[in-house]
Amino acid sequence: MASVSLLSALAVRLLRPTHGCHPRLQPFHLAAVRNEAVVISGRKLAQQIKQEVQQEVEEWVASGNKRPHLSVILVGDNPASHSYVLNKTRAAAEVGINSETIVKPASVSEEELLNSIRKLNNDENVDGLLVQLPLPEHIDERKVCNAVSPDKDVDGFHVINVGRMCLDQYSMLPATPWGVWEIIKRTGIPTLGKNVVVAGRSKNVGMPIAMLLHTDGAHERPGGDATVTISHRYTPKEQLKKHTILADIVISAAGIPNLITADMIKEGAAVIDVGINRVQDPVTAKPKLVGDVDFEGVKKKAGYITPVPGGVGPMTVAMLMKNTIIAAKKVLRPEELEVFKSKQRGVATN
């Protein structure tokens, strides 16, 4: 009798609905019948999105439009940046988007970099433009991000896109936060009225993730209608734990290995790991990538979890491709774009 009861309980855990009529086990989960978290495959989800983008690109071209073009500016010789850019250009080729990488030395002046951006802004053949971050210390990253034309800003970092996002209006969404949103949405994890903790408040990742999850879902862009708590470097870990232990969804984007451990997570919570940290493998003594979450410990308690690598990273690249086809279709509101172009020409606007 005890074994029958155990099997019944396990069946209830695996099959209970999580969003509407969707069962617990969704496509793109790496799961077996076991009493631990469903591991969400970001690679498989990203492949699905890239297939959607590829179809959209081919339909766009078949309608008589030019093939979308993505320009990437890469400054310096940071190996990680070179690897990220290569992943982006490979993905572009995969979905039928033309791309180019413009490499600048680490010694490039800020003004020279800004001039290159202006030329690409004015190039009608360029639909999407991104400058790979981080940049050398002598270059103001915020100034560079704001120099990219908002309608070509596939990173979603321009102040106009950030502002529109905060106002529940259509904008280019930052790729990583949008990727996190798509993981949650496509996995069927409910957000309406749920408690969410976002560890990390960076302007490019943590803050926009929180914005997407807490905002009204009735507007033009994604909105999760969740109750969101944001922590940061000055949040004591014990204080963080008081929030995460109550959270239905925990998203860590702090860049701190083992920040989130099993004792901080409530049973069945969804844990999304955005962290990318390079540490030394204690067995091989070689460098390896880990996230912010103690993966092995947390997956025994959580309901869903993303791995590092293979979780959020591939989704970031996929959403960049989605932003590029959006940029090619020129759907940004013309009034904001005209203000930006007037300022670039040095024309005063009211």
Swiss-Prot record:
Cofactor(s) required, per the database record: Mg(2+)
Chain residues that bind NAD(+): 200-202, 233
Cross-link (Glycyl lysine isopeptide (Lys-Gly) (interchain with G-Cter in SUMO2)): 50
Transit peptide residue numbers: 1-35
One GO molecular-function entry: phosphate ion binding
GO cellular component: mitochondrial matrix; mitochondrion
Residues in coiled coil: none
Alphabetized UniProt keyword annotations: Acetylation, Hydrolase, Isopeptide bond, Magnesium, Mitochondrion, Multifunctional enzyme, NAD, NADP, One-carbon metabolism, Oxidoreductase, Transit peptide, Ubl conjugation
Pfam families: THF_DHG_CYH, THF_DHG_CYH_C
Record-stated family: Belongs to the tetrahydrofolate dehydrogenase/cyclohydrolase family.
PANTHER family the record matches: BIFUNCTIONAL METHYLENETETRAHYDROFOLATE DEHYDROGENASE_CYCLOHYDROLASE, MITOCHONDRIAL, C-1-TETRAHYDROFOLATE SYNTHASE, CYTOPLASMIC-RELATED
Protein name: Bifunctional methylenetetrahydrofolate dehydrogenase/cyclohydrolase, mitochondrial
Organism of derivation: Mus musculus
